[in-house]
Amino acid sequence: MRSIIIASLVALALASSPAFERTFEPKTDYHYKFDGLVLSGLPSASSELSQSRISARARIQAVDDRYIHLQLVNIRMAASHLPESEQMPSLNSMEQRELSEEYKQMLELPLRAQLRNGLISELQFDKEDAEWSKNMKRAVVNMISFNPIAPRNEIEKIESSYDKEEQSEENTSFFTNEKTLEGDCQVAYTVIREQKKTIITKSINFDKCTERSEIAYGLRYSSECPECEKDTELIRPQTVYTYVLENEELKESEVRSLYTVNVNGQEVMKTETRSKLVLEENHSIKSHIKKVNGEKESIIYSSRWEQLVEDFFKNGDKAEFAPFEKFPLDKKMHLIKTITEQIQEVENNMPETSHFLARLVRIFRTTSTSQLKEIHETLYVKADKKIQSLMEHALAIAGTKNTIQHILVHMENEDILPLGQILKTIQETPFPSQSIAEALIKFAESRVAKNNLVVRQAAWLAAGSVVRGIVDYKNIRPLVREDKRELKEKFLRVFMQQYKDAETTYEKILALKTIGNAGLDISVNQLNEIIVDKRQPLPVRKEAIDALRLLKDTMPRKIQKVLLPIYKNRQYEPEIRMLALWRMMHTRPEESLLVQVVSQMEKETNQQVAALTHQMIRHFAMSTNPCYQRVAIVCSKVLSFTRYQPQEQMIASSYAQLPLFLQNSFSGAQFDFAAIFEKNSFLPKDLHASLDAVFGGNWNKYFAQIGFSQQHMDKYVQMALEKLESLEKESTTVVRGRRIQTGIKLLKELAQKMNIRARPATYTEKDAFAMVYLRYKDMDYAFLPIDRQLVENLIEKFTSNGKVQFSEIRRLLNQELEFETHHAAYFYEAIRKFPTTLGLPLTISGKIPTVISAEGQFSLELEGTELRLTVEARPSVAATHVYEMRMFTPLFEQGVKSVQSVRAYTPIKIQAVAGMKRNFEIVYKVVVPENQKSIVSLTTRPVVFLRFPGFSKFEYIEAEERTVVVPQWQQKTQEIEKVFNFLGLEVSTRGNILNQHTLENWLLAEQDFEVSVENKNRPAEFTARLTVGQLEKTELSQIKYNKIFEKEFELEQENTESRREYFNKMVKNIQKEQGYKSVISLKLEAPRDYTMNTELTTVCDKQVRMCQWEVEIRRSPILEETKEWTLRSQLLVVRPEMPSSLRQLRDQPHREVQLSLTSTWGSQKKSEVTVNAQLQQSKEQKKYERNMDRQFNGMPEYELLIKAARLNQINAVAEYKLTRETEQVLARYFDLVKTYNYWTVSSRPENNENDRVVVQLTVEPMSRQYVNITMQSPMERIELKNVQVPRVYLPSIAQRSVKHQLTEASGSVCKVQKNQIRTFDDVLYNTPLTTCYSLIAKDCSEEPTFAVLSKKTEKNSEEMIIKVIRGEQEIVAQLQNEEIRVKVDGKKIQSEDYSAYQIERLGESAIVIELPEGEVRFDGYTIKTQLPSYSRKNQLCGLCGNNDDESTNEFYTSDNTETEDIEEFHRSYLLKNEECEAEEERLSEKKNYRKYERDEEQSDEYSSEETYDYEQENTKKSQKNQRSQKKSDLVEKTQIKEFSHRICFSVEPVAECRRGYEVEQQQQRKIRFTCLQRHNRDASRLLKESRQQPLQLDDYPVSFVESVKVPTACVAY
């Protein structure tokens, strides 16, 4: 039964075909009424639209079963601005438009069409017909092209679905592919039969097209954003056909198409086309339509005209056809002359100026080479400077082959001067072609370019950018894939030849930047060869990595395949690896690749590489950039599984992102910053700061980027500065030279004794290179190379015969010139064209024509010690953003556009004077000229426009424009009109401006806002005078302190009196000493006798223990004030004495920092506030010091002292008397803080003292990332608990100077203790030290500066002797009678004389010896050598390693040979002589040598930061020599047991094996536990503290006792 039904359906389908083929009966003349309507406007029902209607009678003659003829007659046109309606407006309701006879005759030419299965398959037109006319006729026959019969595959689907549902015989629906006017796309048919009438509906799926006449220009600068594509599709076309048949005869055909522009998912513009064919009559043929025999063409819209225009733009006069030759030259010249005259009529740049620029660009694009030559000779040569400059830039913006060739010819003749600017504009040509690229390359090799490095650079970079446009995958025709391999190979050969011919680093980098701008995918292998070739200079290899940036979208996996091995290979330089990671992350890698990156990070030996990797992945994980959504999720996932924690370093490679994106919006910006450091340089190796922009889902990667890169330049600059420094008196040079030579001799003799081979520098002067580069729209725009030759030229210029030439410096600093400059540009231009169902092309374009001008005078004068700068300028700028949908045809032009214009004109005069007489003084003066107006205006408006005819050969036709006012958007603006006098200047603000700022609002709302500043009196001067006084001696007795303590500051009641007495005595002793005073004043003056004076007076003692700052500000009354406004404020800070030992810290009664602030301010009414504050230690921090029940000495004591002396709590009491307004403002700000921390705030009402606030702020001392704040106001008590903040720096009252803090934080440290050494690169190993000197660290360069040696005082002792050879001095130190004894060149020195020898005491029993770079700390048992992180990379030797940031190559022997044998390594640095015994037995025992892996790093050295194994620190006691190694492998921790609702802690610490060790022996012990509810705040606090140190819980009740197995010995396998 089923097969019979299916066969019947097939037979029915086949039977119906002939009937359908006879829709048009042969030998019959059909007369249809054709109506077409175009609507352009905003997507608002209430707004007006520009509407154009075309009406005609369409005669269709069916010659036979296959062919029809079509002719349009009685063609009429009308157009008006009308509100939208569903019905097609009548012709009488619109303004009638005249059609020229030429165009009417063109439209009346007939066509011949072939019908196959109801579809138009072939078309033939008259040979005289024009392309635009053909396309309009295609639109008519397109309305009769349909085939409602399902194809065979659809019939098979009917069979497969028969069992599932019944099929209606009347109604069918199916999909098929079909050629229509808009392309070869998938269409959906729905057929509904109603008695005698059949209604057929057809719609087009534009996402599934194989052919479409679409063209795009200027899109090559955007990157792919896959996450944005679905939600931010910019253009959404919709087309629906409706056919009505009666008795198989076509009675009516209608097609409606809607084309919308969308921003952030909202429609902002639309163009709609409606076409309708209605059968009026049919009869036998009486007069035949002329048969045409033109070439056979497709029904798909013909873009031949667009292709001819494009070919002309790209190839110029060599194009096959000149599409604009009909337009006479004299008319073009007349238009150009008219435009330039209109520009000149306006004194300053106005919004119209930018429109005139756009018109100039359009005209120049239509010109031939001969026409440009005539324009140049007739108009350009005779024009003034501004017009000439605008014409030059307009030619470059036009970007056609003819305009570019014209510019290049005149550049070679040196007729055009701003060569670099013009070439930069050519980089952005929207019509890149092979001929343009070849012309640029030819110019780059010309004489002019070779003589001017700036021009040569600009030409090559422009050539690369043009090549990118040619080969870019974002094709001009999206659905057409051209094979461009031959072109790619040709240009790659040219660029690689440029690279091979390069002789300098700069030339090689220029060649690579050219390749990078070109974005050639076939260049990957060549670039990879350069990256891995270590013979190439490092800057060249880095640039080769950067040259891969444009391939991240086209071949991300290939880039990852190239860069991942480079990142993972530790043999490559760290900066190469970090740049490889940087580039790889921008390919949006998959999880599988990121897992490998994280794995490498966890085992990475280079701290800089590991730190940058962690920061980069972390910031990508937090990114809100919509284009990185997938990457952010993956980065978060892989980061959650890593155990890696970056070390705290002050100078570390870093990466940061600042994404600024609105939620649920695909627009915003992202700022990226990256810095790459390495140990051989104190300057960053690379710095990048970039801005990415996303507008409506269009991603502009590297919209702007500035960067700095250098290699060895810091070394060379340092050498150059030393050369300048050497220009001293001859005698001084001789003496100093002798001393240096003596010191070097000592160090070289030591090297000879120990057979140390000098480590030559890995760089030479010629390797020094640096560059600053600018990147715009992902193109290398310009870069400035800085090499050895440039530095030498500068030195040579300003020195002569060993002396600085001050005359040259004065000549440089005494200049006077006048300037006039004009610049024009398109900040972007993007064009998309596609067909509509009326046969008219729709163009969607955007551009920002901008004109900038500035003229004035500049002078620089140097007189004695005074430098004077004067700039008088009159800058003006006009920019207009035009975004439009435009329907263009010779008959008419119609569309809608959004226009945003900005204009600014600000005449100004600036004077700056800097001088040093008695005081240092800077005077900065801004002068507003009299009778001149400064204006900043903003105008935005949506506009619909009509132009009839579309263009004329003989004149420019103005468009009929109408501003569209949409009430719903006007409600989002506010009217402002205000005029007021500000400091003698009349300021007026007028117009309306948006109060809700979104991109769509800016496109749709009408705004007209202007701010003007006018000076009608004499020139208005605004002066700022900064005076810095000299340091003067003063008496400290003038500092008064009265009530500085509050009752809330009392820490322990029983010690209050002694603490007060101690503090008062300390202050009185300080006041007896000499004080110093400095005064800084700032005076501001403005017209109308407005002044503001600020004076800051600082008084401090010599050691900065007590300081007082006084600020006094006075200013003239403003607004409603009637009296002078004043502020008087005094801040007193007293810090406690600096303890030198833990014992002194414990015994010191006063260890807090006291602050007292008194301030009074106001005009008629005064506000007063007095704040007393105390910076102190919290209870938790004090507990840290109290738990230290052992005696420490030397460096362990000092380091513990620093931590124990940290202040982590502030108590402040404020008594105030405020005005009502001030009190309300402060209350609002505090409410904001409470709201922001809503979940962590608790408050309760209290009745406290009026006009008094008590605040306590406590920083959690261990992690330093959580803050508790308690505030007590007159009416309430507020608490903020556990507020997370960035890691806080806690001051320590025992801290050394800022200089030493920086050295500690940013330097590399090597530590030697007992028989254990931790190297500069953080490698920990054991080696036996003996009574013979071992070389700890030495400068092993060819000109050494220091050496550090050490030996044991005697066998089996832990005490050591240190010897430091520093230049010409030999310093020996050792511990004797619990005090460090120091000898310099064999002579004992006393501690009071240390400073003369650059030695400093550290605590009570340690010293610091300064080195030429860094320092050495010694306490008799431990040696810590601290060097700057950049110091002597690969030129250090000794047991501390080479300080190269790599932990895998530490063991280089004295003869510079790498070894894995630690014994061999140690013996090479052993200095044997008759004074010592070598202890061969200890040196030969292998058990004395061991290298620790990372997991075993906690050994018997004391650990860093918060955890501290006190048991290992008391190195003074003799019993330490018998302490077993197994015991040292134990550590005590608080044992924790967690349950569902409670957490239990062991009351006393329990022994555990260290990480990396396993239990060897154990015993049962009964352990007491105390339990707390899990929700208890103390529970979470104790849980956190237990991770840092054992807890003391003796005061807590015992909850239960449990038997626990406790290890007594551990072993490492």
UniProtKB/Swiss-Prot annotation:
Q: Which residues form the signal peptide?
A: 1-15
Domain of life, per lineage: Eukaryota
Please state every residue range assigned to the domain named VWFD: 1308-1477
Cystines in this chain:
C1310-C1440, C1332-C1476
**UniProt KW keywords:** Disulfide bond, Glycoprotein, Secreted, Signal, Storage protein
One Pfam family matching this protein: Vitellogenin_N
Classification via InterPro entries: Lipid_transp_b-sht_shell, Lipovitellin_superhlx_dom, Vitellinogen_b-sht_N, Vitellinogen_open_b-sht, Vitellogenin/Apolipophorin, Vitellogenin_N, VWF_type-D
List the subcellular locations: Secreted
Does the keyword section mention Glycoprotein? Answer: yes
Q: What is its main location?
A: secreted
Q: In which tissues is it expressed?
A: Expressed in the intestine of adult hermaphrodites.
Question: Which Gene Ontology CC terms are recorded?
Answer: cytoplasmic vesicle; extracellular region; vesicle lumen; yolk granule
Compositionally biased residues, Acidic residues: 1495-1512
Positions bearing carbohydrate: N1268
Regions annotated as coiled coil = none
Domain (Vitellogenin): residue spans on this chain: 24-687
| Region (Disordered) residue spans | 1491-1531
Q: Describe what happens without this gene.
A: Simultaneous RNAi-mediated knockdown of vitellogenins vit-1, vit-2, vit-3, vit-4 and vit-5 increases life span, causes accumulation of neutral lipid and an increase in lgg-1 foci in the proximal intestine; however, does not affect fertility or pharyngeal pumping rates. Expression of transcription factors pha-4 and daf-16 are increased.
Q: Name one GO molecular function term.
A: lipid transporter activity
Function of the protein: Precursor of the egg-yolk proteins that are sources of nutrients during embryonic development. Together with other vitellogenins, may play a role in modulating life-span, acting via induction of autophagy and lysosomal lipolysis.
Q: What is this protein called?
A: Vitellogenin-2
Query: Can you name the source organism?
Result: Caenorhabditis elegans
| Name of encoding gene | vit-2
